[in-house]
Design a protein with these regions (language model features):
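His/acidic metal-ligating clusters that form di-metal
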Residues: 3-82
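Binuclear metal-dependent phosphoesterase catalytic core
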Residues: 75-115
Length: 115
C-alpha cells in the first residue's frame, strides 16, 4: 500500500519491512519485476518524505520492468526520477479503458484497450 493518508503514521507507508523481506526471500526465483501500487511517488497520498528511499528500494528488485499505479485515474507514463524506471498510470473504469501489458524476452509493451 502506498496510500499514506489512510494511516496515522503509526505504520510506515510504504511498508519498507515488506519490501526488504521480498528482496531477501531467497526461496523466490523470478527474473523480472513489476511493481504495482495505488498512489505513485509525488502524489498527495504518497508520503513524499520517503519517495527517494522508496525508489532506492524498488531499484534493487531483479530486472524491474515498470511500476503501475491507478490513483490519478488517468493514463500517464513518466520517468519520475530520471533513472529509466517508468511509472504507468491507468484510467478508472468509468473512462471505459484499461491497460494491457505484454512482457517479452526483450522488454515490455502496453496498449490501451477501450470498451
Amino acid at each position: 500500500n502506498t496510500n499514506a493518508i489512510e494511516y496515522d503514521y503509526s505504520h510506515p507507508v510504504p511498508d519498507f519491512g515488506f519490501l526488504k523481506e521480498e528482496l531477501q526471500d531467497s526461496t523466490r526465483h523470478y527474473s523480472r519485476t513489476v511493481i504495482a501500487m495505488h498512489a505513485r511517488p509525488g502524489s498527495e497520498q504518497f508520503d513524499n518524505n520517503v519517495k527517494d528511499v522508496f525508489q532506492l528500494y524498488i531499484r534493487e528488485f531483479p530486472s524491474l520492468q515498470f511500476c503501475l499505479n491507478a490513483h490519478n485515474h488517468q493514463f500517464q507514463v513518466a520517468d519520475l526520477f530520471d533513472d529509466g524506471i517508468l511509472y504507468s498510470g491507468c484510467s478508472n473504469i468509468a473512462k471505459r479503458n484499461y491497460l494491457l501489458f505484454t512482457l517479452t524476452p526483450d522488454g515490455d509493451t502496453y496498449e490501451i484497450i477501450k470498451f
